[in-house]
Amino acid sequence: MPKLILASTSPWRRALLEKLQISFECAAPEVDETPRSDESPRQLVLRLAQEKAQSLASRYPDHLIIGSDQVCVLDGEITGKPLTEENARLQLRKASGNIVTFYTGLALFNSANGHLQTEVEPFDVHFRHLCEAEIDNYVRKEHPLHCAGSFKSEGFGITLFERLEGRDPNTLVGLPLIALCQMLRREGKNPLMG
C-alpha cells in the first residue's frame, strides 16, 4: 500500500488531515504560484493543486501525494492575504453584506502509476453587514493577517457570518476531506480501514 504525503507545510492542512487518523508525512512542494493572466480562480487552484502533488513525485516515487490550493474570490477578484491590519479592515469592509467564495483545488497523485485525480470544491461565506467597530475589534482580536479574506472561520471569524454554504466545512480551512476520502478509496486506501 503506498504511503501518503501531504504536499504542504500548512499547519491547518496538517491538522485537517490528522482528523482521518491515517499515517502521513508532510513535504514542501516547489511550485511557482503566480496566476496566469488567462486563468479563472477554478483553473488556478486546480493547476496549483496538481503541480504541488506532482512536484514531489521524484522524491516520493511510490506514494499517494496530496496537493491542495485555495483562493478567496469577492466580486470576481481573487482576494489574497492582507498582511497588514489596514488591508484586513479593507477586505472585511468589502466582504460586509456580501458573499465570498472560496475555491479549493485538490489533487491526489499516485506516483507509482501516474494516476491523477483532481477536483475543485467551492464554498460560499455569507457575511453579515458589519459596522466599523466590529471590523476593528475583529482584526484586533484575531490578527487575520495571513488568512485569505482576512478571517479565520475556525476561530473568532465565525462571528462575522450569516451562513456558510458548501459540501464540506473542511474545505473552508483548506483541505476538502470528503472529496479526499473518495479519492483515497478509489486508490484502495480506505481511511476507515486503517
UniProtKB/Swiss-Prot annotation:
One of its GO terms (biological process) is nucleotide metabolic process. PANTHER family: 7-METHYL-GTP PYROPHOSPHATASE, BIFUNCTIONAL DTTP/UTP PYROPHOSPHATASE/METHYLTRANSFERASE PROTEIN-RELATED. This is 7-methyl-GTP pyrophosphatase. It is found in: Cytoplasm. The record marks W12, Q70, E154 as: Important for substrate specificity. Its main location: cytoplasm. Its cofactor is a divalent metal cation. Pfam families: Maf (PF02545). Nucleoside triphosphate pyrophosphatase that hydrolyzes 7-methyl-GTP (m(7)GTP). May have a dual role in cell division arrest and in preventing the incorporation of modified nucleotides into cellular nucleic acids. Keywords: Cytoplasm, Hydrolase, Nucleotide metabolism. It catalyses: N(7)-methyl-GTP + H2O = N(7)-methyl-GMP + diphosphate + H(+). The active site is at D69. SUPFAM superfamilies: ITPase-like. It comes from Shigella boydii serotype 4 (strain Sb227). InterPro entries: ITPase-like_fam, Maf-like. One of its GO terms (molecular function) is nucleoside triphosphate diphosphatase activity.
